[in-house]
Amino acid sequence: MTLITDELSLPFILKAFAWAFVPYSIICVVYNIFFHPLKHYPGPRLMASSRLPIFFLVLIGKSVNTLEKLHAKYGPVVRVAPDELSFTAASAWKDIYSSSAAWPLAIPRNMVFFRAMAGEYGFHSLVTANNQDHARLRRLYSRAFSKQALAAQEPLIIQHIDKLIKKLYAEIDQTAKPVDINLYLNLALFDMINDLQFGEPLHLLDDTTHRAFARASLIIVPSAAVIQALADFPLARIILKPILREVFRMRRLYFSTTDQRLEKRLASNSYRADIVQFLTDAKSDNISLEEIQANAPLMNIAGSGTSAVALSGLIAHLLLAPHILKELQNEVRSKFRTSSDITMKNMVDMPLLDACIKEVLRVFPAVPVTPGRLVPSPGVTIAGKWVAGGTRVYVTPLAAFHSTDNFHDPETFAPQRWYNTKGENSFASKDVKDAYKPFSVGPYNCIGQ
């Protein structure tokens, strides 16, 4: 008598799996396109049929630019996966990220991305904490980044800026080749935030010892997006493990080095007005050392990489618009006689500088895509449209800021749209300023803006 196990050979199992998988996949595709609750939303049918297209776009780093093109074609809301919608409408910011009567801390977060951002710690960080802990941690860190706290650190900040400028002059004098300003901005700002947080610089501009640590910090955000994408396809993570080995090695390097720097700072028992000192002194807020450890990696990233991107973009756009650069030079030099006059206290009433910073964050957003939220059951209304529960939703800043629905001549770097509100050439009456949220909105917006 033939036993059932004799028939269950590997070829038989593979054939059975294939016969079952193919019709199942066809049924899923048909359902996603024709019967899914999101079937009426515009977007490419290929992306509506499966999560594979958006998965591959995230893996190759093309998702944000593709979303911008899709919004230009399909409008203010695009279905980019069977259960995923991207928005650009101004009202979507409030509907997705702001508080409401039903959701005091906005629509619940999609935690896979945030956990990947924060690393594997036993205690929650600002981006992974529950509502109550988040409010407590945010109050504390907001004070650490207040104007008063930053003013106390102003001499240290100026010291790092002066060092960067001297380094750039030295590099320019030593070579006839172009100097990579973005590289030096990243190094200088990462050095600065480490000094502000741990009370000790890394000397990245002069010493290459810790540059691998600085480079590793730049992959945390994009790798978090990849980890979120891989969560939908566990088998892909196994298959792609050899390719992603270096990415995960750099992640380990970043988190472990941050831990070591924090441990060294805590063991020093010295007093210095840095962020760690501020936090350890705040005993009334009941912040634990484990929570400080969980948040330290985030502070490094938030205080360096995005600022370097914004400054690089500003320099590039000013060089491409020499007439604006000339106006900005006149504004700065008419206000400050010497470099020592440039202080936080004196950096007021500079409308063109303020407008240039706002405009570069629109044209070249440092954070081109916002983390997604997961719509609770049974659903919510976003930008005037009903969205079923279980849908991943977000605003794509790059697409929103470059949308002709929101901004007049959106591809043009035009600082005057932020301060010149009169005259026939004014952008004021043509732009939807509520669509401009470079630091997001709501209880989880950027505390370091």
Give, region by region, the residue ranges found by the protein language model:
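Structural signal for hydrophobic/aromatic residues that build the beta-strand cores
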Residues: 43, 70, 80, 89, ...
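Conserved cytochrome P450 K-helix E-x-x-R motif and the immediately C-terminal K′/meander segment
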Residues: 57-67, 340-383
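Cytochrome P450 catalytic-core helices
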Residues: 306-331, 449
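N-terminal membrane-proximal hinge/A-helix region immediately C-terminal to the signal-anchor transmembrane segment
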Residues: 2-137, 159-163, 167, 188, ...
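Conserved cytochrome P450 K-helix/beta-meander segment immediately N-terminal to the heme-binding cysteine loop
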Residues: 269, 377, 381, 395-427
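Cytochrome P450 heme-thiolate "Cys pocket" and heme-binding signature region
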Residues: 123, 143, 297, 302, ...
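Conserved, non-catalytic sequence blocks in retroelement Pol enzymes and Pol-derived host proteins
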Residues: 38-42, 56-61, 147-151, 266, ...
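Cytochrome P450 heme-thiolate monooxygenase catalytic core
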Residues: 106-118, 152-311, 327
